[in-house]
Regions:
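N-terminal auxiliary segments of SAM/dcSAM-dependent transferases
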Residues: 1-51
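Conserved SAM-binding loop and adjacent beta-strand
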Residues: 58-74, 82
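Conserved class I S-adenosyl-L-methionine
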Residues: 83-94, 155
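Conserved SAM-binding loop of SAM-dependent methyltransferases across substrates and taxa
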Residues: 95-106
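Conserved SAM-binding motif I beta-strand of class I
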Residues: 108-113
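S-adenosyl-L-methionine
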Residues: 114-162
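A short, conserved alpha-helix within the catalytic core of class I
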Residues: 161-169
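C-terminal substrate-binding/active-site "lid" region of AdoMet-derived donor-dependent transferases
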Residues: 170-233
Length: 240
C-alpha cells in the first residue's frame, strides 16, 4: 500500500515505514497508517494521509512519454463497459495510465511494451497503483504473440501498427468484445477504421476527444482560453 501525504497543494507518495523529508520537517509513515490520519513532522506541520485514486496516480506516476489523459480513459471505459472480471489485452503500455485504471476497476490486464526501460517504469507504476498482481506488463511486441492470445473482452491499442492488430481482433476477442484504438492523428484513425471493416467488425465509430475547463471571475463565465483541449482520436469497434 502506498499513501498520498497531503499538505495544502503539496502531495507526496510514501509507503508505510518510509520517511518524508521536506522544508516542513521530517516524518515517518507508521506501519498502521490509515486514510484520514494526520501525521505531524518534527517541526509540527501536519500531512493528511489519503489513499491514492486514479487522478492522483496520473499526477504522480513516473512518465516515459505523454500518458493517456483521464478523459480518454473515461471514454474507453464508457464506450466499452469495461468492468471487474474482464480480460484486457493492451498494447503500447507507455507510462501505464490506462492499464492501471483498468486494473483498479477490477480487470485482468496483459499489456505489451516494446521498450524494456519503459516496461520497467510501468511495472513500478503498477506497484504504486496496487495492481501489480492483476496487470501483467510484458516486454515485447504484441504482434509476435497474437497466435497465442485469445479470449479477451477488450483490446486497447496505442501503437503505430494498431491496424495490423485490429485485423486480428476476431482471433483475440470473445463474441461481443470491443477494440479501441487511440491515435494522435486522423490518418491513424482512418487506417484503424479500414482495418476494422476488413475484419468484419461492427459498430465502428471514431471520436475526437476535446475538453475545456471553465473560467469564473467577476467579469463573467466562459471556457478557459489557455491550453489545448484536443488530445487525440478514439476508434471503437466490436466483434460479433
Amino acid at each position: 500500500m502506498t499513501f498520498l501525504l497531503v499538505h495544502g497543494d503539496r502531495e507526496y507518495l510514501r509507503a508505510p515505514g518510509e520517511e518524508l523529508q521536506t522544508d516542513l520537517g521530517v516524518l515517518t509513515v507508521p506501519d498502521d497508517a490509515e486514510p484520514g490520519d494526520r501525521l505531524e513532522t518534527h517541526l509540527g506541520d501536519e500531512f493528511v494521509v489519503r489513499e491514492p485514486r486514479g487522478p492522483d496516480l496520473f499526477d504522480h506516476f513516473e512518465r516515459t512519454g505523454a500518458p493517456m489523459m483521464p478523459r480518454d480513459v473515461g471514454l474507453v471505459v464508457g464506450f466499452t463497459g469495461a468492468a471487474a472480471g474482464d480480460r484486457v489485452l493492451d498494447a503500447g503500455t507507455g507510462t501505464g495510465v490506462l492499464a492501471a485504471y483498468l486494473g483498479r476497476i477490477g480487470a485482468d490486464v496483459v499489456t505489451y511494451e516494446r521498450d524494456a526501460e519503459f516496461a520497467a517504469v510501468a511495472r513500478e507504476n503498477m506497484r504504486l497503483a496496487g495492481v501489480e498482481t492483476t496487470v501483467d506488463v510484458r516486454t515485447g511486441d504484441v504482434t509476435d504473440d497474437l497466435d497465442t492470445l485469445a479470449g479477451f473482452d477488450l483490446l486497447t491499442l496505442d501503437t503505430e501498427d494498431a491496424p495490423t492488430v485490429v485485423r486480428r481482433a476476431p482471433d483475440v476477442l470473445v463474441s461481443g468484445g470491443f477494440v479501441v484504438v487511440y491515435s494522435p492523428f486522423v490518418e491513424g484513425s482512418r487506417a484503424a477504421v479500414e482495418a476494422a471493416a476488413a475484419a468484419d467488425l461492427t459498430d465502428v465509430t471514431t471520436h475526437e476527444t476535446i475538453q475545456r475547463s471553465m473560467q469564473f471571475d467577476d467579469r463573467g463565465s466562459r471556457p478557459d482560453t489557455r491550453g489545448v483541449g484536443h488530445t487525440g482520436y478514439l476508434t471503437v469497434a466490436r466483434w460479433e
